Amino acid sequence: MARGGFPNMGGANMNNLMKQAQKLQQDMEKMQGEMEKKEFSATVGGGAVTAVANGKKQIVDIKIEPEVVDEDDIEMLEDLIMSACNEALKKAEEDTSSEVKRLTGGMNLPGMF
């Protein structure tokens, strides 16, 4: 290795690679900030329950229509809440994955999100 560089890689190529990595990091940080502001909602049970998740994959709101609250059937309400939350989180995950793929050109970078 000449001058501590990498074999068969010219200095210009390495500098170019480093610049691309820095740009990707900046773009990912920007995307994270934008994702935190996004909200994803899911409504189930014909409008009975709505859950809202943010881009950080946190549930930030749940709305329950009063007519679905039946003390004799709490299990149904629990199922509706769980279903709405899971669907909202799935939407957030899909959007995040789509944005990461767009930024990375489809490269698989484990642990990015």
Curated annotation (Swiss-Prot):
Residues 93-102 have a biased composition (Basic and acidic residues). Disulfide bonds: none annotated. It is found in: Cytoplasm, Nucleoid. One of its GO terms (molecular function) is DNA binding. Signal peptide: none annotated. It comes from the Bacteria. Transmembrane segments: none annotated. Pfam families: YbaB_DNA_bd (PF02575). Keywords: Cytoplasm, DNA-binding. Gene3D superfamilies: Nucleoid-associated protein YbaB-like domain (3.30.1310.10). Residues 93-113 are annotated as: Disordered. InterPro entries: YbaB-like_sf (IPR036894), YbaB/EbfC (IPR004401). GO terms for cellular component: bacterial nucleoid; cytosol. NCBIfam families: DNA_YbaB_EbfC. PANTHER family: NUCLEOID-ASSOCIATED PROTEIN YBAB. Belongs to the YbaB/EbfC family. Binds to DNA and alters its conformation. May be involved in regulation of gene expression, nucleoid organization and DNA protection. Homodimer. This is Nucleoid-associated protein CBO0032/CLC_0052. The lineage of its organism: Bacteria, Bacillati, Bacillota, Clostridia, Eubacteriales.
